[in-house]
Amino acid sequence: MSSTATTKGGRGKPKASKSVSRSSKAGLQFPVGRIARFLKAGKYAERVGAGAPVYLSAVLEYLAAEVLELAGNAARDNKNNRIVPRHIQLAVRNDEELSKLLGSVTIANGGVLPNIHQTLLPKKVGKGKGEIGSASQEF
């Protein structure tokens, strides 16, 4: 028998193995090949290393997962099953690091964070025992 057992009768080319994407090799969901193409076409540098698009894909995937998790929590808090831009806005602005990263970003249809300044809130009227003998304004 010949060493090429994959071909019929030793004739023809051996079967080519199935191609594996760089995203699946790196265990990522974001497209490494597309990001590599964008890096090359964007003229950020004359040459782009082999690891750069993989690393950038991993960073983008992590950031997207972080925002989606927080936005999903915000949607669940509002008793919604669907994430809308308002939930993304609430998620980003309530997280200190993401708010700093996306500080100059405007999210369309995101609205604003609910905030009432402390001086505008009504004064608390206490009905406790300590206020009976209070002499703060007496002379």
Swiss-Prot record:
- What keywords were assigned to this record? Chromosome, DNA-binding, Nucleosome core, Nucleus, Phosphoprotein
Phosphoserine: which positions carry it?
S136
One cellular-component annotation, GO: nucleosome
Asked whether the UniProt record includes Phosphoprotein among its keywords, one would answer yes
Q: Where in the cell is it found?
A: Nucleus; Chromosome
Q: Give the principal location in a single coarse category.
A: nucleus
Annotated motif [ST]-Q motif, positions: 136-137
PTM info: Phosphorylated on Ser-136 (to form gamma-H2AX) in response to DNA double strand breaks (DSBs) generated by exogenous genotoxic agents and by stalled replication forks, and may also occur during meiotic recombination events. Phosphorylation can extend up to several thousand nucleosomes from the actual site of the DSB and may mark the surrounding chromatin for recruitment of proteins required for DNA damage signaling and repair. Widespread phosphorylation may also serve to amplify the damage signal or aid repair of persistent lesions.
The record comments on the domains as follows: The [ST]-Q motif constitutes a recognition sequence for kinases from the PI3/PI4-kinase family.
Q: Could you tell me what this protein does? A: Variant histone H2A which replaces conventional H2A in a subset of nucleosomes. Nucleosomes wrap and compact DNA into chromatin, limiting DNA accessibility to the cellular machineries which require DNA as a template. Histones thereby play a central role in transcription regulation, DNA repair, DNA replication and chromosomal stability. DNA accessibility is regulated via a complex set of post-translational modifications of histones, also called histone code, and nucleosome remodeling.
Entry protein name: Histone H2AX
Q: Which gene encodes it?
A: HIS2A
